[in-house]
Each structure stands twice: as C-alpha cells, then as structure tokens.
Amino acid sequence: MEGGIHTSTDTSAFKECLSLTWRNPYVLRLAFSAGIGGLLFGYDTGVISGALLYIRDDFKSVDRKTVLQESIVSMAVAGAIIGAAVGGWMNDRFGRRRVLLIADFLFFVGAVIMASAPGAALLIVGRIFVGLGVGMASMTSPLYISEASPAKIRGALVSTNGFLITGGQFLSYLINLAFTKAPGTWRWMVGVAGFPALLQFILMLLLPESPRWLYRKGREEAAKVILRKIYPAHEVEQEIQDLKESVEAEIKEEGSSEKMNIIKLLKTKAVRRGLTAGVGLQVFQQFVGINTVMYYSPTIVQLAGFASNRTALLLSLVTAGLNAFGSIVSIYFIDRTGRKKLLIISLTGVVVSLGVLSGVFHETTTHSPMVSRVETSHFSNITCPDYSSALNSGAWDCMTCLKASSPDCGFCSSPTNKLLPGACLISNDTVKDMCHKETRLWYTRGCPSKYGWLALIGLALYIIFFSPGMGSVPWIMNSEIYPLRFRGLCGGIAATANWISNLIVETKGLPIEEIEKMLEGRALHYKFWEKGNKPHEKSQAT
C-alpha cells in the first residue's frame, strides 16, 4: 500500500518536523491548518463541562431537569455520530478539503445559535450543529494531514492533530475560567468557538485538496504539483511512482477505480483486518474513560472535596494542560518508539492511575465528615428534612446528607476546619449564601477530604499516560492502515464507532453514588438511556 506505516530511521521524526519550519513550511501550513479541526473537536469536548455550570444558573428548567442537562451534552455527541458516518462517505465522494469546509460552516452556525439561545431548546439545536461539524472534522483532519505528509514524519504530523485536540481542551478551560465573572458567562464560552471555525474555513479555501485523493480521482497532474511541494526533490518521483502503482493495483483487482460499496469493502481481507484494528482502537479509547474524565473533570474535582466552581475549573485547567503536554510527547515518540509500544506503555499507566483514583474515591466516600446536630441547629428552619426525620441521624455523615433527595440537601462545613462535623441543610442559593457568610464551605457534589490532593495526582497520572498513546495512536492508525480507495469510508466507520462508544459511556445525570462506583471500577453503566429513579442534580457551589 502506498504511503504505508513508515519504519523510523535513526533521525528523530520530531527533529524532522522542526526542521520543516525553515526547510519546507508549506507542509506545516497544511498540517496545522487542517489540524484546527482537531482544535474545534477538543474545544467542544472541554467547554461544555464549565459552561453547563452557568447554563443551569440562567435556565432553571435545565437545573431542575436532568434530561435537559443530558441532552445539552449528548446531542452534540449524537450529531458527531451522524457527522462522522456521513463524513466518511463525503470524504471519498467530494474530497477531504470540501468536507472540512462544510464542517467549519456547521460548527460556526452551531456556535452562533448556542451563544444567542434564549432557552434550552435552541441551545440543544446549536449543540446538534456543532456535533455534526465536530464529527466530520474528527475523522477528516487526521486523514488530510496523513495524505499531505511525507511518509517518514507522517506519525509526528498527524500527532499535531492530537496536540490541537488537547490544546483545544486546554483553551476551553482557560476561556471558561476567564469568563466566570463576565456578564453572559456561558454565552461567551460557547460562542468563542466560532472564531477558529471561521479561521479554518478561510485557510482551507487557500489550500489544495489531498494529493492522494486527487490522484485517485484521475487528476494526476494536479496531484503531482502538490506532491512536489511536499516531498524533497530526490524523493518525490519515487512517491509518485508508488502512488501510481497502488492505484493501478486497486483498479486491476476490483475492476473499477470508482465503484465502491460496503459489500466490496468487507470482502477485501486487508480492509476487514484494518477495520477490526481501527474500530477496536477507537472503541477502546472511549471505554478507558477519557471523555468522561474531560467532560466531567470539574465535577470529579468537586467529588474529591474541592467545593468551589472556580477552584474546580482552575484545577481542570491543569488537567487539560497535562493532556496537551502528553500530545507533545506523542509527537516526539510516535515515529521513533512505534505505535504498539506506545499503546502498551499508555494502557499500563492508565490502569495504575485509575487504581489510584478508585482508592481515593473509596476513601472519600467512606470517611467523610460527620453531621453535627449542634452545627445543624445553628441554622434555623433550614435543616434537611430527611436528616430531621431520620432515626439514625447520629450516624449521618456528609455523603449521607448529599444523597438525601426530599428535597436535595447540602453540607455546610465547620468554620474552623472543613474536616470537622458540619451541618446538613436544604440545598438552595439562599442557604448557600448563608453558609458562605460565616466563612464556611458549601458542598453539594463531593465532601471535604484530606485525600483530595491524591485525586488530583490520580487525574494527572491518568492524563499523562493516556494522551501520548491511547489519545493519539487510534487517530493516527486510522489515517494510515486502509487502502487509499477505502480510506475515507473506513475512517468514517471507525470515527463513528468512537462517537457511539462515547455516547454509551456517557454518565451525565447519574446519581453521585453511581458516578463514584464507575470511577471505582465497580459498575459500568452501558444503558445510559435507563435513568431509573434518579434525584435531580444539585447546584454546584461557587
């Protein structure tokens, strides 16, 4: 297969990439312009976790109804599933460049709709548009970069797409933090995404189509012009010859260079094996929990005992920064270490770090501060009803208080030490303000814990190990392993599998104790559509 997976030489591919800055900036321009699609992908993944905290404050219907919160998050994922599935076919039919232009247009429209939404319904419509754009871009960006990159540094350049995904997540947390005090908070958070979409649209208008797609469609001369800009003079003729032989072999084998369908795809042994590997990697990437961690890292931080929204967002910014750093590590090692070895190291580290998180959350939930009758009675007429009527109220601790649901209750810490017994009170904004006025901390998601810093270490380890391997390799492999003729369609199938897996492990709206069990590895809730009897989510502290 032309442009197959390249075996690294003694020269670091990372250094080769850096040298392109002065030797051939055209290649970097192609890679980073297409990689903005990854930036959009990452930004959307990260921004909603912080924006949702403030959307709930503006739209009380969202705060009261778990189903609306679920819809705001998951409709973008549903849109991405459709976008990735349709995008695969469109890539082979219309070309990589046109699909990226369409993705940018959809994302821009979605960002404008969300930023101006007067209610939850239109906000969800905007999320669907954004999802369609993200789905198309998520599989097209690495494909375009792969087909417009010299073989020996292809892995490193496709890893720049991974870097821009994680960079987008980091940017989203930074913007979330920047707008926490601004009027319109969440509208700025979701609206800012329109600018990189517009920038990529303009840049892609000025860039050529993928040379390999052009050659496959019979536009050999146009493809050769682009390849001569990408490859050094002593390599370009061999690359053109390899591409020619690859296309001719496919045409000879299948009898036509244009006709293509799923049956032919599945009858081709190389494609079946590639799909097994490509889809498996994409599914497994989601099942190790990365998007759960990124979507809900502010919530996870609060579960570890950090009460403030702003503190949670700030600590999540550190997490996103580590994710971006891990992508840089991937760029350096992907072509010199190899895909398989990087995956093994990554998965080993992920397992260890999830073990750390499991232990921390187990300790947090089983050793939370007790509820004191003295502290609770300090606040008149706002005691949690379930606590007042409980026969075993002396055994109540903070976690028991947070699980009360008739109505929702919160934990107001001791003014001297948050680990000492505190008060169990009705959860609403008025009570929260009363708690804060006495220099106490207000908890509605997690409880005070002396182990909170270990949760941060566990999160950091998880991201550091995940990002260079499981974060980047699935996208790189899916841009390389398929025959040129099936590359767009197969890449779309694999990306669709990724987004479907993302939706399956979606946890928004699950009760606190179920999220804890998931993080502890005790339960994995595949049936996200079965809500059962769930209490409404509680407002988070600020």
Give, region by region, the residue ranges found by the protein language model.
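Alpha-helical transmembrane bundle of multi-pass membrane proteins
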Residues: M1-Y231, E250-T542
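Short intracellular "coupling" helices and adjacent cytoplasmic loop segments at the cytosolic face
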Residues: K229-E239, E245, K252
